Amino acid sequence: MKKLLFILAFLTTFSAFADSVSWLRYPSISPDGEQVAFSFKGDIYIVDSRGGLSRQITTNMAYDYAPVWSPDGKTLAFASDRSGNFDVYTVSVHGGVPKRVTTHSSKDTPWAFTPDGNNIFYF
């Protein structure tokens, strides 16, 4: 009986690890709390905060990460190395072609939008 319980516990634990998403990173909650943007395997996704299927926002060979919501919830800023080094880009939450915001030779990562949504703080 102890052996059976041990095997059952092992299989339950093993299956829990198999379902974990180890590549999901940099979660960012929308201003209204209804959505979560995140980085997964180098692209940006959005999912409903209550769960469900995610929508892919960026698709490319580059590494996109650190999404940040604009105050109105219509735009995401994120870092990407699609131009050779990490710069800040913006994209509509509905997808589309990202717009490059910074062109520095150093690594730029967005931190937040200004309250009016016209500028982005980055480091």
Where do the model's predicted regions map?
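Multi-bladed beta-propeller domains
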Residues: 18-22, 48-65, 80, 91-107
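Conserved beta-propeller blade repeats
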Residues: 21-36, 61-79, 103-123
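Blade/loop signatures of beta-propeller domains
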Residues: 32-35, 45-49
